[in-house]
Amino acid sequence: MLNKLKNLLVEEMDVNSELITLEAELMNDLGFNSLELADLVVLCEEKFNIIFDESVLPTLLTVGDVVAYLEENA
């Protein structure tokens, strides 16, 4: 799932692939702002055919958090 998310981040959000690790923080390390986080959620929902529970969104701080959520729910 990390590779799928990594491809999405690189291709759709123009993130440098070298920055993408499970520990990378979306806002601090990848430079996302709140709008880009919302875009990421929408892209993941479309690509992986899931709906993110709004209550979990504030807990998605790292790439690893997103990967774990996708693995549990996709």
What spans do the regions from the language model cover?
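Thiotemplate assembly-line natural product biosynthesis machinery
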Residues: M1-E18, E71-N73
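Phosphopantetheine carrier-protein modules
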Residues: M13-G31, F48-L61
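Two-component histidine kinase catalytic core, primarily the HATPase_c
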Residues: E36
